[in-house]
Amino acid sequence: MISHEHPISIYWNDCSKSEQKKLLTRPINNKLNDIYINVKNILTKVYNEGDRALFKFNFDFDNVQTTQLQIPTEIIMNSGRNLSNEIKQAIHTAMTNITRFHQAQCYSEIIVETLPGVYCQQIIRPLNIVGLYVPGGTAPLLSTVMMLGVPARIAKCKRVILCSPPPIPDVIIYTAQLCGIDEIYQIGGSQSIAAMGFGTESIPKVDKIFGPGNIWVTEAKRQINLAPNGAAIDMLAGPSEILIIADNTANPIFIAADLLSQSEHGPDSHAILITPYSCIAEKTKKELHKQLKILPRNDIVRNVLLNSRMIITNNLMECFSISNSYAPEHLIIQIENASDYLHYITNAGSIFLGNWSPETAGDYASGPNHVLPTYGRAVATSGLGVIDFQKRMSVQQLTQNGLLQLSSTITTLTQIEQLKAHEYAITHRINYIKEQNEHSLLG
């Protein structure tokens, strides 16, 4: 049972360096080795047995007897029949905002003449076949369909498939259809990642796999990414996390609501409040317990709060420094004139400024993607975007004059690196040009 002392308020500057480091350390799953072995066995079975293994896993894991994996076109076309206008309008509004934001991300192709006669281009091409994974659970995660399907459509991927555990709710199928996805397969978990990574009789092998999932799905993505005949992946997502920076103008009701909203994602979620004001921490703590009573999933949230932190600092600058070290998936800055402090933030998956920007808005409908780096990976990686569904290719074209101008530079560098064949690739051409010029003069 969680006491009213939790989460415990901790004064940052009263802690040693090792204690400070421990405060920002994410929970570690002690069952990783067992999961690794079990996932490896699932992947091997799918690789060897294809669809037959998938049908068996559907029965074993989801207690569903399937005779076909692909959702028929007729079901896709009729998926919105039993959905209310209110639901359809909410999906439409969210998709409009997500589309608007992601369309603005599109990169322009470039061409640069680095020297006279040396033309360099960068061109963009969509990925050919991509696989989207949408987790199952107690409620349909249609927001994930939009966050994956919209950028895939904008990127103009040639073929997009979607996998989700059976039975797939109509609202998931309907949302996928709106995203232009007409290949939907009823298979979930590690086995769906294996199917997309290796390919089976029914499910095509994809170039890249996208989407969040539990620790089994994440481990499957990791193994598929490392397999020589596997597929690329978007990222390895860990448990969800939120960090809130608050000053004395912040509303404890809002802070508590945001901490709780993130905590209900699962028992491994991480929630941290950092503030220079102990009174804000205490008021938030009281509000947490008040709001906790009305939540239907409060057992999960209670466990998360046991491992949550309320860190008291000397000033706001210290808050920013701690946040950058932690590199949260979601960062909420509930301080006065929050946008004035944005330049102090260097590491975060997604940032929410001010009292009126709850993390929930980003989860569903404001526009940016909610597939974000976790476990501190925001120090080097970004949230999902259109570019993740595309690839950049460089193009170079040199004229004779361009090669002549660049040849001495190239040959000098090849000689330093002692790569003689590289040097000859230049000198043979230069000699040919000189011979042609001599013949022209003689002719």
From Swiss-Prot:
Q: What is its EC number?
A: 1.1.1.23
Known pathway: Amino-acid biosynthesis; L-histidine biosynthesis; L-histidine from 5-phospho-alpha-D-ribose 1-diphosphate: step 9/9
Protein name as it appears in the record: Histidinol dehydrogenase
Sorted alphabetically, the Gene Ontology cellular component annotations on this record are: cytosol
Q: Name one GO biological process term.
A: L-histidine biosynthetic process
Annotated active site residues, numbered on this chain, are E329, H330
| Quaternary organization | Homodimer.
Q: Where does substrate bind?
A: S240, Q262, H265, H330, D363, E417, H422
* Binding-site residues, Zn(2+): Q262, H265, D363, H422
The alphabetized UniProt keywords are: Amino-acid biosynthesis, Histidine biosynthesis, Metal-binding, NAD, Oxidoreductase, Zinc
Q: Which residues cross the membrane?
A: none
Cited PROSITE patterns: HISOL_DEHYDROGENASE
What the record notes about the co-factor is:
Binds 1 zinc ion per subunit.
Binding-site residues, NAD(+): Y133, Q191, N214
Q: What does this protein do?
A: Catalyzes the sequential NAD-dependent oxidations of L-histidinol to L-histidinaldehyde and then to L-histidine.
* Catalysed reaction equations from the record: L-histidinol + 2 NAD(+) + H2O = L-histidine + 2 NADH + 3 H(+)
